[in-house]
Amino acid sequence: MKVLKFAAIAVLFALIPVIYFSFFADETESSTKKRVIALGDSLTYGYGDKKEEGYIGRLEEKVNQQHTKRSYHFQNLGIPGQQSDQLLAQIVKPDVAEDLSEADVFIINIGTNDLIKNNGGDLFPLHHDEIMDAKKDFLDHLDKTLNIVGTANKDADIIVLGLYNPYPDKDSDKIEAYVDDWNKSMMKEVKKHENVKYVSTNPLFKGKSKENYFHDSLHPNGKGYELIADRIMKNYDF
């Protein structure tokens, strides 16, 4: 019995360094490898960029160029045409929920389709009642999305991008007023949640030529997505 006892103790002591170094290796890997998940619509997806990178691909490149001792992997889950209720349905799917639990940073860009589609598919003319009803539903969906994402990983940061006026070179004061209203409401919602940062995108295209920064009436081209990527870099410390 004594021989067996001594043998068991010897095995236990032999395993201690293995367990320690295994734990240390896992901790080191988690500190040097970071995962970023992007959620949203065609803007997150990067529609309109000839390089098919959008602002997410460009941001990943910029972040990894900045960090030499830490690597960032970006996972783009953006779906063209997606509205906030559809995003809610997406993030509760088992495979997506599993991904969310492993993320260190989330980037959410949603709401453009809620605004445009509920106005009839474009922004000309504007329908006040429909837009205000859509905003109410959107904010409810955003609140639930932030709760779900925040619960998936309580240590992760969440970046929420504001909306922009897609007609910066037109006489679009009325559109601008609604975009500002939605953005202000988004900022108020963001403040209710922990580890969530709001990043404005509306100033990016003001005073700039539509044909130089847009692929079509709504989506940026490569230069436009570059502006968004730079904006995030300036407002969030990866």
Residues of each region from the PLM?
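Active-site segments of SGNH/GDSL-like serine hydrolases
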Residues: 146-179
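Histidine-centered active-site loop/cap adjacent to the catalytic His
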Residues: 215-238
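Serine-esterase "nucleophile elbow" of acetyl-processing enzymes
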Residues: 24-80, 95-98
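Oxyanion-hole/transition-state-stabilizing segment in secreted/luminal serine hydrolases
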Residues: 89-133
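Hydrophobic membrane-insertion alpha-helices, especially the h-region
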Residues: 7-20
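Structural recognition of the beta-strand scaffold that forms the well-ordered cores
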Residues: 36-38, 73-78, 104-109, 157-162, ...
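Surface-exposed cleft-lining segments at the edges of enzyme active sites
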Residues: 79-84, 115, 122-138, 170-173
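Substrate-gating cap/lid alpha-helix
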Residues: 166-201
